Amino acid sequence: MKIINAVFYKSVSALTGLPEETFPEIVFVGRSNVGKSSLLNSLTGVKGLAKTSSTPGKTRLINYFQINGNIYFVDLPGYGYAAVGHAEKAHWGNLLVSYIEKRRAIALVLVLVDSRHPAMASDREMMAFLEYLDRPYGIIMTKDDKLTQKERAAARREMESFSAKAKFIVNYSSFSGKGKAELLAHFEHYTC
């Protein structure tokens, strides 16, 4: 898949604000500060399209980006961030779960996992949830540039042991662009 055009479409705080289900949706989900926004910016080649922050929990809404006029990339709030209040964490969790359960337009879910901390309990729970719902998902191991070759191989093996039903695993670096072409090629199977 080649990305020709990428624009911010809308943010929503409740399922009632979601756009019509006219385009396939590729969903980006992962722990807080795993690099979802950086990955979106890297994939699209549009710096600042998705707002990035070194502060976990920055994304608090469901953010839609229209790609090539006929696909949505959907950035969900991160899970696992402890510094927000219980009520806010419950709201994010309910929004995330309800969206994944009910949205028919979801073509693929990308579970972003920090390569330095593979297979954390919250990531395994997300994969189990997606498998329970029979949602196709791929795993993106982010921050690949921060690992040595030996660490990278060990992290990949560990991730593979927990994700037998993943459609693919891609090691990705938003800094260098490593994995970008591979990931975009996978999208072809889910957006046609």
Curated annotation (Swiss-Prot):
Annotated signal peptide: none
Query: What SUPFAM superfamilies does UniProt report for this protein, alphabetically?
Result: P-loop containing nucleoside triphosphate hydrolases
Annotated binding of GTP, by residue: 30-37, 57-61, 75-78, 142-145, 172-174
Q: Which cofactor does it need?
A: Mg(2+)
Binding positions for Mg(2+)? 37, 59
The UniProt keyword set, sorted, is: Cell cycle, Cell division, GTP-binding, Magnesium, Metal-binding, Nucleotide-binding, Septation
| Single biological process term from Gene Ontology | division septum assembly
User: Domain EngB-type G spans what residues?
Assistant: 22-192
- GO CC, any one term: cytosol
In Gene Ontology terms, what is one molecular function of this protein?
Answer: GTP binding
Family (UniProt):
Belongs to the TRAFAC class TrmE-Era-EngA-EngB-Septin-like GTPase superfamily. EngB GTPase family.
Q: What does this protein do?
A: Necessary for normal cell division and for the maintenance of normal septation.
Q: What is this protein called?
A: Probable GTP-binding protein EngB
Q: Which organism is it from?
A: Chlorobium limicola (strain DSM 245 / NBRC 103803 / 6330)
Encoded by which gene?
Answer: engB
